Curated annotation (Swiss-Prot):
Organism: Saccharomyces cerevisiae (strain ATCC 204508 / S288c)
Keywords: Mitochondrion, Transferase, Transit peptide, Tricarboxylic acid cycle
Extra remark beyond the main annotation: Citrate synthase is found in nearly all cells capable of oxidative metabolism.
Protein location: Mitochondrion
Protein name (Swiss-Prot/TrEMBL): Citrate synthase 3, mitochondrial
Amino acid sequence: MVQRLLPGAHICRRSFNSSAIIKSSALTLKEALENVIPKKRDAVKKLKACYGSTFVGPITISSVLGGMRGNQSMFWQGTSLDPEHGIKFQGLTIEECQNRLPNTGIDGDNFLPESMLWLLMTGGVPTFQQAASFRKELAIRGRKLPHYTEKVLSSLPKDMHPMTQLAIGLASMNKGSLFATNYQKGLIGKMEFWKDTLEDSLNLIASLPLLTGRIYSNITNEGHPLGQYSEEVDWCTNICSLLGMTNGTNSSNTCNLTSQQSLDFINLMRLYTGIHVDHEGGNVSAHTTHLVGSALSDPYLSYSSGIMGLAGPLHGLAAQEVVRFLIEMNSNISSIAREQEIKDYLWKILNSNRVIPGYGHAVLRKPDPRFTAMLEFAQKRPIEFENDKNVLLMQKLAEIAPKVLLEHGKSKNPFPNVDSASGILFYHYGIRELLFFTVIFGCSRAMGPLTQLVWDRILGLPIERPKSLNLEGLEALTKASNVNKL
């Protein structure tokens, strides 16, 4: 059963370096981290000392020229991808996270992404009180953007790509980085780097609702606010309110959502951001954040660079492509009830050497549990989606497309991935600016790579510096290989 936050948690706060620090009888996130750090440091020290020469795996020329796909060459603690069970967060599956991580206390609410962040950071599930206090801490940290960031965002062209706006906004916040300031002044030693990195990371994550809302108002409302920030609600409720997508007093409710639709949209945001926080370390946004951070760049610069990677069409634009595909397909078939028409359309796509967007996965060999979670969100609300032919087509394709892809014979994984459902659900509730989907993705993904950045500092990991090979170097390896075969 999902844990629920206990009401009336005793919370007091004080300001420190523009951050709000929350004290309660339970351990804070920082205190919980301090409890697990010695054991982790000892484990890494022992691993390097006793087994440092152990081979991890072979690297082939194909992998070097093929994007390093499959090379096991990064340390990443928060998540691991299982071909059978999907992504695991500190060893917990999505289903286990849904059952064990605390939510708001309201029946039917999804777990809070704040609880997931705690899990990623500490490796443990937060208690009711810890989750309540941490939710409040982040809400206080995020209550105001730096004035210079506000000024920068106000000056940007309103039609600038929203991901460019997000990267610029995050990079501008480097001016207030505790880590960068104290490192430059020589006030912190290597073993203490993690503390300011944690402060910066939490401040960055807490700022994302206001950053996101400001960017959305830029591209949809000439920069005029669509909602108000509140310290009394959770991270995702603030995101939704600032997008103008709730029907409370803190939001303009531009899509005229009912009370139930507003609650559902908030829970969709919690679900989406909760399950997109991390996906191992090899994807472009995570690896870029880690790479830039390994040079001791602060979290703002590091994650801003990760956002630039996420903006690339091969990484963060799949959900948009699925939405366009569903809309186009619906305009070319007479009814989703006609399965043969759907099959014929899919075969037409495949026979023209195109792919069916939203299907397949580089590692998974079963349906993506993240897709299953999004699909169940829709299935639990049949009345809400009964007249949305795009959502209905998404559900129908999940039954038909895998069979077609199996018959086609070229797909190792014919099942739907999370992008097959996520974008069209946002589209249903009123987010029609497709390029903005990736900004929401970027809000969620901050949690995983920044958690790893904190742990990179805790463990004192060095700058990343792999050796490169030119064409002649690769050819020389083939000659040596041929000699060894003789």
